[in-house]
Amino acid sequence: MQKLIMGNWKMNGNSTSIKELCSGISQAQYDTSRVAIAVFPSSVYVKEVISQLPEKVGVGLQNITFYDDGAYTGEISARMLEDIGCDYLLIGHSERRSLFAESDEDVFKKLNKIIDTTITPVVCIGESLDDRQSGKLKQVLATQLSLILENLSVEQLAKVVIAYEPVWAIGTGVVASLDQIQETHQFIRSLLAKVDERLAKNIKIVYGGSLKAENAKDILSLPDVDGGLIGGASLKAAEFNEIINQANKICTE
């Protein structure tokens, strides 16, 4: 299966640094049949990034509102996302859930706004350290996915990318063990298999949580890991390109 390598730039960068970053990422060498690339800049820089990256690199937004156009000051609608030429959308990132109190219902409502568009949704799920240590991992992940799995058709679900990001490993330098990552991805796939086995086999489940060049090969080689959602390491073109290179090599072997 083609690996999907995505960079979440979060609220970082300025016009100068982003131009340098785009220039660096444009130099990445990879087979597009084996690896797909996408980046998520801050919304004010999206048009700049689209114009500065090769067409083969997807560009996405980090968030939208679940409202339609109208009197919602400061928000960005699904229609606007399509209008500016975005390819991807992050939904339900742990920082949105924890800092802005986004609920599973909010995540579903945002997904529902774009599921029948050309945009590829990347739905983020993950547990806290307390959840894992108290044995609630499976319950938490199943709950986060329940509205989506119960209300979307198999055809709609096939458009979704799922990003598993253990909250305790994001930006902390702490990485889940290879066994933890594989077991969790396998569990997520088992939830999808209850809906449709073919869907479970073909859907992309990517890992996010302190993924960087030095651990990319081991993580991306796991059988149920179809790519990565990279945070800090995606702000350095050389390191992001090395992760892309590792993914390309894995798909060549």
Swiss-Prot record:
Cellular component annotations (GO), alphabetically ordered: cytosol
Catalytic activity: D-glyceraldehyde 3-phosphate = dihydroxyacetone phosphate
Cross-referenced InterPro entries: Aldolase_TIM, TIM_sf, TrioseP_Isoase_bac/euk, Triosephosphate_isomerase, Triosephosphate_isomerase_AS
E.C. number: 5.3.1.1
One term of GO molecular function: triose-phosphate isomerase activity
Pathway where it operates: Carbohydrate biosynthesis; gluconeogenesis; Carbohydrate degradation; glycolysis; D-glyceraldehyde 3-phosphate from glycerone phosphate: step 1/1
Protein's UniProt keywords contain Isomerase: yes
UniProt keyword list: Cytoplasm, Gluconeogenesis, Glycolysis, Isomerase
Binding site for substrate: N8, W9, K10, G171, S210, G231, G232
Active site: H93, E165
Subcellular location: Cytoplasm
GO biological process: gluconeogenesis; glyceraldehyde-3-phosphate biosynthetic process; glycerol catabolic process; glycolytic process
Pfam families named among the record's database cross-references: TIM (PF00121)
SUPFAM superfamilies: Triosephosphate isomerase (TIM) (SSF51351)
Main location: cytoplasm
The UniProt record lists the keyword Disulfide bond: no
HAMAP family: TIM_B
Family as reported in the entry's similarity comment: Belongs to the triosephosphate isomerase family.
Function of the molecule: Involved in the gluconeogenesis. Catalyzes stereospecifically the conversion of dihydroxyacetone phosphate (DHAP) to D-glyceraldehyde-3-phosphate (G3P).
Assembly description: Homodimer.
UniProt name for this protein: Triosephosphate isomerase
